Amino acid sequence: MRKTIKNTILTVLLLSLGISTALLTYLHFFASNDKDLSGEWSADLDITEQAAITAFSWLQDIEAVSVSLEDMESYMESYMHGLTIQVNLAFEQTARDEGIFRCYVSPESYDACNQAAYEAFAAAFLDLLAERLHMAGYADNVDKEAIEALVTETFGMSTVTYLMTYAPALLPSLEDLQERYDGSGTYEVSDDILTRYFESDEGVILKTEYYIRKDTDLILPKDSGSVFSDSFSAFDPMIYTLEQTQE
């Protein structure tokens, strides 16, 4: 079983890397040379695959029932059309090719994503529990409402609360994401390189990365020091979209 999980993750890794490489290659040749990054940008940090893998691994312990990683991804994608956390990035140009910036993870978006992830997890858990009870010859009603009532009676809490309390975390913590993405300071651009100077209590932290500007899209590589547990997520670029202001 563990070998099957490993092979599945490897397949997803290769597909993700191939798609990301093709996207970046295309944009590299067709991107504009606009160095003015001024404006409010936002990106959706997709954690659907990580949440699905974590839930999938935990659900393997339910005896005599089967669930695939694809099944878990379907559950996760049925909520909010996938699980994403909004990251906001603002640039204000103060001189030619330089200015100030601010980046932060939306706490409200994180809370909504976390809730949706566990609701999807609970839906899968209840379906598998109903299947297990049916196989064991449980004669009473095994629809979702009845199983939810059974879980509440057994554990003294709802399925979502039970999974939040006793199952593994489906998302990186908000603190970890804030440590990775939040910050402000000054920036400068040169050719295809964006350099940001993050101001912190320890001093100034320098971060240099290639960027691609294509109309209202700004593509940045995901941080190689990603807080995500699944290795393939580090290959996905972050695609920020410029928020249009009404004139």
Language-model region placement:
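Positively charged n-region of N-terminal signal peptides that target proteins for export
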Residues: 1-7
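Lipid interaction determinants
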Residues: 10-247
